[in-house]
A protein has these predicted regions:
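Long, charged N-terminal interaction/targeting segments
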Residues: 1-77
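Short linker/helix segments within small regulatory modules
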Residues: 99-112
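Short cysteine-rich clusters marking metal-coordination/redox-active sites
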Residues: 82-85, 115-118
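Extended interfacial segments that mediate partner engagement and assembly in macromolecular machines
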Residues: 1-12, 108-111, 124-145
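Short metal-coordination and nucleic-acid-contact micro-motifs, chiefly zinc-binding Cys/His arrays
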Residues: 75-79, 108-111
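Intrinsically disordered, low-complexity terminal tails and inter-domain linkers enriched
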Residues: 142-163
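Active-site/ligand-binding-proximal alpha/beta "capping" segment
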Residues: 91-98
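Short functional micro-motifs and their immediate structural scaffolds
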Residues: 87-91, 123
Length: 163
């Protein structure tokens, strides 16, 4: 399973889908129909699907480095996608998030982003700092401190109630 790798690729701004409970035939067909590279740990699936790439490591950091290097991924425009559903993020004004993010976050942060699809809110918090540190440790280009965030709120239907 490469769900964690998919989430990290999204955090780095790459359009990345994760198939969920589909069979191999459906996964391969979806990749072909959407002109995507299929990343898989499954040797047989990688052999059967044209253009698939087999990720060999079980370690997330090794997987990330492997894929970034293999496909020469540009990381300059990181955090433009929702880490959960892959939709694009849009900047929102601070008053729009009041009561939808934790009170402390609202008090400390000035910039917020919202997923255009699932409605999650993001901000530049400590999680973004941790991601940046991890990317720098891995030597991944484009690991910078500014830019959109990684901390996130639940989707609006499960949002934090107003204080």
């Amino acid at each position: 399973m490469l769900g964690s790798l998919a989430k990290w690729l999204r955090l780095l701004g790459h359009d990345t889908t994760y198939p969920g409970p589909l069979g191999d035939v459906e996964i391969g067909a979806t990749a072909q129909n959407e002109d995507r590279v299929l990343l898989t740990r499954d040797r047989e699936l990688a052999r059967r699907v044209r253009g698939a790439y087999r990720v060999r490591s079980d370690d997330l950091e090794e997987q990330l480095l492997d894929v970034v290097r293999r496909f020469s991924l540009d990381l300059a425009e990181s955090m433009t996608r929702c880490s959960v559903c892959n939709a694009e993020l849009e900047s929102v004004r601070k008053p729009q998030v009041k009561g939808r993010v934790p009170d402390g976050v609202y008090a400390r942060q000035e910039e917020f982003w919202r997923c255009a699809s699932c409605g999650r809110f993001y901000w530049h918090g400590s999680h973004w700092d941790n991601v940046t540190v991890r990317l720098r440790r891995l030597g991944v280009a484009g690991a910078h401190e500014d830019g959109p965030p990684v901390d996130e709120s639940p989707a609006p239907d499960s949002r934090v109630p107003p204080g």
